[in-house]
Amino acid sequence: MAERLSPADIEAQLANLPGWKQVGDRLEQTFTFKDFLGSIAFVNRLVDPAEQAGHHPDLSISWNRVTVCLTTHDVGGITQKDIDLAKVISNLAVV
């Protein structure tokens, strides 16, 4: 089982994750795209990496925005799994 990261570890990791912030026990970022098709294309790109990691983000989709929330439910907080998936998601957003 993954271990919860300490507040200091989370802060240090967020320094390398531009745009991501800690909101309670989760990481969150809102990505903005040209239009709805861009938003949906981004969400579709998330599917395979999330499945491969066995770790699935909570998503909120609006016309040209996708808010991604990451937390590790079984430990009730942020783990390295969340940090790792946040890095992958950030890279997918710049395609």
Curated annotation (Swiss-Prot):
<dbReference type="InterPro" id="IPR001533">
    <property type="entry name" value="Pterin_deHydtase"/>
</dbReference>
<dbReference type="GO" id="GO:0008124">
    <property type="term" value="F:4-alpha-hydroxytetrahydrobiopterin dehydratase activity"/>
</dbReference>
<comment type="similarity">
    <text>Belongs to the pterin-4-alpha-carbinolamine dehydratase family.</text>
</comment>
<dbReference type="Pfam" id="PF01329">
    <property type="entry name" value="Pterin_4a"/>
</dbReference>
<dbReference type="GO" id="GO:0006729">
    <property type="term" value="P:tetrahydrobiopterin biosynthetic process"/>
</dbReference>
<protein>
    <recommendedName>
        <fullName>Putative pterin-4-alpha-carbinolamine dehydratase</fullName>
        <ecNumber>4.2.1.96</ecNumber>
    </recommendedName>
</protein>
<dbReference type="InterPro" id="IPR036428">
    <property type="entry name" value="PCD_sf"/>
</dbReference>
<keyword id="KW-0456">Lyase</keyword>
